Every structure is written in structure tokens, then in C-alpha cells.
């Protein structure tokens, strides 16, 4: 099953409470940004330095211009593996943003 990034994020927003989405498609919890969708098929997530470092050893994960705690995720298609990583990383980033990150 192949989803779009929009489908994946919509499902996550149905599941997770307390997510603020800005007009620039930045996702925040209690005012703390934890994810950003700068392009239609690109997702950036604030995972913390250690997790981001490990995440960058997986396919389609790159350094983000936002800093070492962020990962830029750019899969060629949103297949099952990409969907699983996007969902897991979004949840981790959301949890880490609690209380100011």
C-alpha cells in the first residue's frame, strides 16, 4: 500500500492530540516545533541529536538545515517502509516536544 505524505500526516493528526499546525505546515506541541513539511513530499522532524544521527543511517534521511537534532526525510515513494519511519519519527518528535523539548 502506498500513501501520500498528506495521507500519513492526516492519519497521525487524527490519532495524536495537541498538535498545532501553522500556515507554513510546521507542526508544534505547546508552541514547540517538532516537524515541518517544507515541500509536498518532504518531512523534517526534530528527533534529538542522538536519534537523528541514527536515523541518518537509514535510506532517504538527510541532514536538515534546521540543525543536528533535525532529520530531513525525502523518500522517493511513500511505501510501507517510508510510512513506518515517518509515523514512528513523528510520534517520537511529538513526545520529545512535550514540556519544551
Place the predicted regions along the sequence by residue.
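Charge-dense, helix-prone N-terminal extensions
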Residues: 1-101
Amino acid at each position: 500500500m502506498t500513501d501520500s505524505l498528506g495521507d500519513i500526516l492526516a492519519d497521525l493528526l487524527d490519532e495524536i492530540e495537541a498538535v498545532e499546525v501553522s500556515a507554513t505546515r510546521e507542526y508544534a506541541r505547546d508552541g514547540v516545533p517538532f516537524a515541518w513539511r517544507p515541500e509536498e513530499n518532504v518531512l523534517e522532524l526534530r528527533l534529538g541529536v542522538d536519534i537523528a544521527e541514527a536515523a541518518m543511517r537509514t535510506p532517504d534521511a538527510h541532514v536538515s538545515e534546521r540543525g543536528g537534532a533535525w532529520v530531513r526525510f525525502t523518500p522517493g515513494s511513500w511505501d510501507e517502509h517510508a510510512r513506518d519511519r515517518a509515523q514512528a519519527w513523528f510520534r517520537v518528535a511529538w513526545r520529545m516536544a512535550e514540556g519544551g523539548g
